[in-house]
């Protein structure tokens, strides 16, 4: 059923892209591909959230490097030129496509770089075990 829904979703995406070429990348791997990087964490937990993506976006030493992930209000950006399909989730690329919807994996960095480098729309199909 998952394969069928992936195929169906790809077909629907292709119809939206109409005459444009679509670049498809399959991200396959084991647990590291799933992604356990935390997007956000309560400030009173562990080390005050240091090491989370939210911390990196707000920290003055790293904010510039991660500024492309948030808008002026500090809200996560959902890319409209890079789409991702993972497990039962699909959407424009944004934080939340890791092992859980509160985590990230390599798809976020990869998709950001590839989306910036290519003019065509991008589809990431992530599969891991």
Residues covered by each model-derived region:
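Short, surface-exposed loop and linker segments with low hydrophobicity and enrichment for Pro/Ser/Thr
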Residues: 1, 18-19
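Sec-dependent signal peptide recognition
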Residues: 2-9
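Cell-envelope and extracellular/periplasmic
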Residues: 19-129
